[in-house]
């Protein structure tokens, strides 16, 4: 993060704009809207500045820039068409530890101006860090279309209710659930827009007096195989509403950055062959947090019902009568194959796909004879440590040694690495890779050279 987004309280605080043209006028409008006590310095001014000055809204200082104008300022903007003058203003402000924006020169500025969506008191700021103002503007326009014009009235009304809500609902969780109900109530929003006081009062009383569901719940969310962009919209909504997020080592930092900031985070770092927290204890963590009335998200890599032990966790909750739901995710087989240019099925090469765990329990044995058959694709999860055994068994049961294989490490992430070869090389290839990795075996692997689009690693 190159810039920290902050919202400044400028009401009745001295601010300076150097420049008297159209660009300076646009900046002045923003500062005046924020209630700043504004001084504008330039050699000449467009008529709008004169009109504002005549109305007593700002002070004009006609003449060359004088550094002393900054002495009482909280914030300054250099908005002239003279680069040297803009630089001088910036340096003078820097020497006084005053934040200064330099129009069209973000590297010379100590702060930048974002694109703004104003639904006061709700404000949304969009910034590209000065690298692409057009992109920021396009995003602002898209957000403008999504946010109702009366949203600010709802936010202002919520501020008026805060004291009563705090008295009415004892816990933070109860208050949050009330606010969520209020903000999605279309009737209240429309009543506020129409200034219909009777309807506003009736709807508010109904919302406040409705019994809240004090039971906790658990939502099992599949986070996908790595790329945060593959998280589903519903999954995103759930992690942003959670009181507690229980997650493991397969969840990327990019995804964790999307979690609600004040949610509790419980790390239970699992990996094949080793569990930082035993599965039974994970089950109990989910149960305990839900019994406290909290909304718990169990965030799992891939899809929670495909080698994710999601069923085991939900059985514990079901036996205890805890409400639960499941948000599917893109499983590793689908994500890794797509990002590696390997179609799992193909009319000429594979009419079926088998998803197999390579993390076998002691004494467990797979149906190797059927797995060795042609016209199918095998995908082994957690199979890196068993690669030599997989190679030996498949060849022993008749799979050709030249069968194409691929191992995908950190699939779909920017650090994805893929190596391919033949079945006779599988054990050797596995020694070059690290967990988490996925093994794909089948004729479809031979299409990778033609269909690979994501990387050449």
Swiss-Prot record:
Domain of life: Bacteria
Pfam families named among the record's database cross-references: CysG_dimeriser, NAD_binding_7, Sirohm_synth_M, TP_methylase
Entry EC no(s): 2.1.1.107, 1.3.1.76, 4.99.1.4
Region (Precorrin-2 dehydrogenase /sirohydrochlorin ferrochelatase): 1-204
Pathway as given in its UniProt record: Cofactor biosynthesis; adenosylcobalamin biosynthesis; precorrin-2 from uroporphyrinogen III: step 1/1; Cofactor biosynthesis; adenosylcobalamin biosynthesis; sirohydrochlorin from precorrin-2: step 1/1; Porphyrin-containing compound metabolism; siroheme biosynthesis; precorrin-2 from uroporphyrinogen III: step 1/1; Porphyrin-containing compound metabolism; siroheme biosynthesis; siroheme from sirohydrochlorin: step 1/1
Signal in keyword set: no
PANTHER family reported in the protein's UniProt record: SIROHEME SYNTHASE (PTHR45790:SF1), SIROHEME SYNTHASE-RELATED (PTHR45790)
Name of the protein described by the UniProt record: Siroheme synthase
Organism: Escherichia coli O81 (strain ED1a)
Gene: cysG
């Amino acid at each position: 993060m190159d810039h920290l987004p902050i919202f400044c309280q400028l009401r009745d605080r001295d601010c300076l704009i150097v420049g008297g043209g159209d660009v300076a006028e646009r900046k002045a409008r923003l500062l005046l809207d924020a209630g700043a006590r504004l001084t504008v310095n330039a050699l000449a001014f467009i008529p709008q500045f004169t009109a504002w000055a005549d109305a007593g809204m700002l002070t004009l200082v006609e003449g060359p820039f004088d550094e002393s104008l900054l002495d009482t300022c909280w914030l300054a903007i250099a908005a002239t068409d003279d680069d040297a003058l803009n630089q001088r203003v910036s340096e003078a402000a820097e020497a006084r530890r005053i934040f200064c924006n330099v129009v069209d020169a973000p590297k010379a500025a100590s702060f930048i101006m974002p694109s703004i969506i104003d639904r006061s008191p709700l404000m949304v700021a969009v910034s590209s860090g000065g690298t692409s103002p057009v992109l920021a503007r396009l995003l602002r326009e898209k957000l403008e279309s999504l946010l109702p014009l009366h949203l600010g009235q709802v936010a202002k009304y919520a501020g008026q209710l805060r004291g009563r809500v705090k008295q009415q609902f004892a816990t933070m969780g109860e208050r949050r659930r009330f606010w969520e109900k209020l903000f999605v109530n279309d009737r209240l929003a429309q009543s506020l827009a129409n200034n219909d006081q009777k309807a506003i009062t009736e709807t508010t009383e109904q919302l406040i007096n409705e019994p809240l569901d004090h039971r906790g719940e658990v939502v099992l969310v599949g986070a996908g195989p790595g790329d945060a962009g593959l998280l589903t919209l519903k999954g995103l909504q759930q992690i942003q509403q959670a009181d507690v997020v229980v997650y493991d080592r397969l969840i990327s930092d990019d995804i964790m950055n999307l979690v609600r900031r004040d949610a509790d985070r419980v790390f239970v770092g699992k990996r094949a062959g080793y569990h930082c927290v035993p599965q039974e204890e994970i089950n109990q963590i989910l149960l305990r947090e839900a019994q406290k009335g909290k909304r718990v998200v169990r965030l799992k890599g891939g899809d929670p019902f495909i080698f994710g032990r999601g069923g085991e966790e939900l059985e514990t909750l079901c036996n205890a009568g805890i409400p639960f739901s499941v948000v599917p995710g893109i499983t590793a087989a689908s994500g890794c194959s797509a990002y590696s240019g390997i179609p799992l099925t193909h009319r000429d090469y594979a009419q079926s796909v088998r998803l197999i765990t390579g993390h076998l329990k002691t004494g467990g044995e797979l149906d190797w004879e059927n797995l060795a058959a042609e016209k199918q694709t095998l995908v082994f999860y957690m199979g890196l440590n068993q690669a030599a055994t997989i190679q030996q068994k498949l060849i022993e049961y008749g799979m050709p040694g030249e069968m194409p294989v691929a191992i995908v490490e950190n699939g779909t992430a920017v650090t994805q690495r893929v190596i391919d070869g033949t079945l006779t090389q599988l054990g050797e290839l596995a020694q070059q890779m690290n967990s988490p990795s996925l093994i794909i075996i089948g004729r479809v692997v031979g299409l990778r050279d033609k269909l690979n689009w994501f990387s050449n690693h």
